[in-house]
Amino acid sequence: MGENIFDNLLSHPSLFVNKEVLRHSHHPSELPHRNKEIKAIRFNLVEALKGQIPSNMVLYGVTGAGKTAVTRFICSQLEGKGKQIGKSVNPVHVNCRTIDTQYRVLAFLGNSLLKDNEKEDIPFTGWPTDRVFEELVKRMNERGGVHVIVLDEIDHLVKKVGDDLLYNLCNINDDLKRRGQARCCVIGISNDLKFTEYLDPRVKSRLGQEDVIFSPYDAVQLKDILEYRAEIGIKTNSLS
């Protein structure tokens, strides 16, 4: 059998300790230069650990400003602390670039609340939207606690299908209170600082109870981030 083209490469040591930390999809455990934004968001969301309803929020900033990474980090910490102290907090992250209709968002939220042994998925299509919403409310109350719905790229969703979904989600606590004890807040993440111009004033006032602006990283901050990623992802002395 002839020589395999990979034979000589396998004998070479890898440059990487952990290549995953260099990928765009990596969720870092440390977020340099975002302390101010983390402080503002956690100050609001800590209310969930006290059994209260956090304010709805919108996070603004250009692509690459760390909005998604910061939100995922905080929600992971929030959920972990809730388990530690016996408070049910249920964050759900929705990518509205791919899940981009009212039906699909509601179905995704509802199905995210199923336990591992439950198989009653809301179908990808086929139900009236009102029925999907009712099922979501029922499942949220069955799960209990405080639900944190994160709508990433919310500006894309609004521009495509309007603000009916946001109206329903911003008013969902009224439906939850009538039928149980669960509560909910909504966090929107937007690349467009002006996307709220597309919203009905009633939706705008309820969704934007608190705003957090993520400024772009400057050159020094980007250098710090790259050096941090390289330090944990690439073997020492591999770069010169």
Regions found by a protein language model. Name each.
Residues 76-88, 115-118:
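Post-Walker A helix-loop "phosphate-sensing" segment adjacent to the P-loop in P-loop NTPases
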Residues 2-17, 54, 71, 90, ...:
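Mid-core helix/loop region of P-loop NTP-binding domains shared across ATPases and GTPases
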Residues 44-48, 78, 82, 139-140, ...:
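Hydrophobic helix-cap positions at the C-terminus of alpha-helices
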Residues 56-58, 81-98:
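Conserved catalytic segments around the Walker B and adjacent sensor/switch elements
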Residues 52-75, 98:
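Walker A/P-loop nucleotide-binding motif
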Residues 1-55, 77-80:
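A short, basic N-terminal segment
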Residues 25-30, 63, 92, 152, ...:
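Acidic, polar-rich N-terminal leader regions of halophilic archaeal proteins
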